């Protein structure tokens, strides 16, 4: 039985929402029957790893480079460095999951850059959910390419039992938490300045930044709907059914892979995203309807050209089952055995 420590395993209180990636990761490992996760959820997921009873044979670090953004960031940054060095000295394996090209928050840039290069150098295995991540890891450390492995971002099959037959209300659906790096305000401004496009757009997702929400609201036109709240997966399924495409207007500078992309595919959506990372990978995947853009004008062209292009339910189902969370857990365990 392989013992894993997964970071960050944050304690989620009742009524709170969090990124489900970590809990799904934990479950996928334990479902293999060959692994157990030894660190419980905690309100401080880094300092909670101080007791060695919470040290597994393998440490898996996600978003390690974001530690400087934490409360008491300088102290936690030093602890993060010492934790990796201590784990290596004790013969533990280090796995780093490379999620992004760079941190989305542009603060503590030097510390984050140092942590990124540090974890790339000291990892025994680097996992990335986009093929571009292999080249990126090599730029962080010239020896990293040999230990970097591409694994599809795991997902779930949420395809409806029957194909949607209702009317399409929106050309484009933008969903998920609204943050600066996702490029929503820039795209809304583009639409406002190009009213002849006439695209019907629905934006649904909680916007934690009141100033950003107000900026978006000021730029709305008659063809753009903004719903400032987080939808349930049941509601999201209906929005996807009512939309011709899901659009992710992310800024390409930081995005590498996207959970929103995978969740959209899990509902059978046609997806438009920037020509980078996993979007670029899946634009070449014949089973999927994923399209990429380099500038906003290309989004208009994609909508016009592919609006009536059918989705292969069989192709989507095959892709989703192939890249399920249980399969992901098995692949991770096998890779850890070899490193």
Where are each of the predicted segments found?
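Acidic donor-binding loop of glycosyltransferase active sites
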Residues: 240-255, 269
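Nucleotide-activated donor-binding/catalytic signature segment of Leloir-type glycosyltransferases, i.e.
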Residues: 213-234, 245
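A charged, aromatic-enriched C-terminal amphipathic alpha-helix characteristic of glycosyltransferases
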Residues: 294-301, 307-339
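Glycosyltransferase donor-sugar binding loop
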Residues: 200-214, 229
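Nucleotide-sugar-dependent
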Residues: 248-262, 276, 280-281
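Conserved donor-binding/catalytic core segment of Leloir-type glycosyltransferases
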Residues: 165-183, 188-192, 201-204
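Donor nucleotide-sugar binding/catalytic pocket of nucleotide-sugar-dependent glycosyltransferases
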Residues: 121-159
């Amino acid at each position: 039985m392989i013992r894993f420590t997964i970071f960050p395993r944050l304690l989620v209180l009742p009524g709170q929402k969090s990124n489900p990636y970590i809990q799904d990761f934990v479950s996928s490992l334990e479902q293999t029957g060959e692994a157990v996760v030894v660190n419980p959820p905690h309100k401080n997921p880094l300092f909670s790893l101080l007791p060695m009873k919470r040290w597994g044979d393998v440490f898996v670090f996600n978003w390690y480079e974001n530690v400087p953004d934490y409360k008491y960031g300088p102290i936690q940054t030093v602890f993060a460095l010492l934790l990796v060095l201590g784990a290596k000295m004790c013969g533990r394996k280090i796995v780093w999951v490379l999620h992004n090209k760079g941190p989305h928050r542009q603060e503590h840039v030097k510390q984050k850059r140092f942590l990124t290069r540090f974890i790339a150098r000291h990892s025994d295995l680097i996992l990335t959910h986009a093929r571009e991540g292999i080249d990126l890891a090599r730029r962080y450390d010239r020896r990293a390419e040999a230990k970097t492995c591409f694994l599809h971002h795991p997902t779930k099959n949420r395809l409806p039992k029957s194909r949607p037959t209702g009317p399409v209300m929106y050309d484009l659906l933008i969903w998920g938490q609204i943050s600066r790096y996702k490029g929503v305000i820039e795209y809304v401004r583009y639409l406002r300045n190009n009213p002849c496009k006439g695209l019907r757009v629905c934006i649904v997702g909680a916007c934690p930044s009141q100033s950003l929400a107000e900026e978006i609201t000021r730029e709305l036109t008659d063809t753009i709907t903004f719903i400032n709240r987080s939808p349930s997966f049941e509601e999201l399924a209906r929005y996807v059914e009512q939309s011709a495409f899901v659009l992710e207007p992310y800024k390409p500078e930081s995005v590498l892979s996207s959970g929103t992309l995978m969740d959209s595919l899990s509902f059978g959506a046609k997806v438009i995203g920037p020509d980078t990372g996993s979007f670029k990978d899946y634009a070449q995947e014949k089973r999927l309807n994923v399209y990429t853009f380099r500038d906003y004008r290309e989004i208009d062209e994609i909508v016009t050209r592919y609006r009536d292009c059918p989705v292969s339910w069989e192709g989507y189902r095959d892709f989703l089952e192939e890249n399920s969370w249980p399969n992901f857990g098995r692949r991770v365990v096998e890779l850890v055995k070899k490193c």
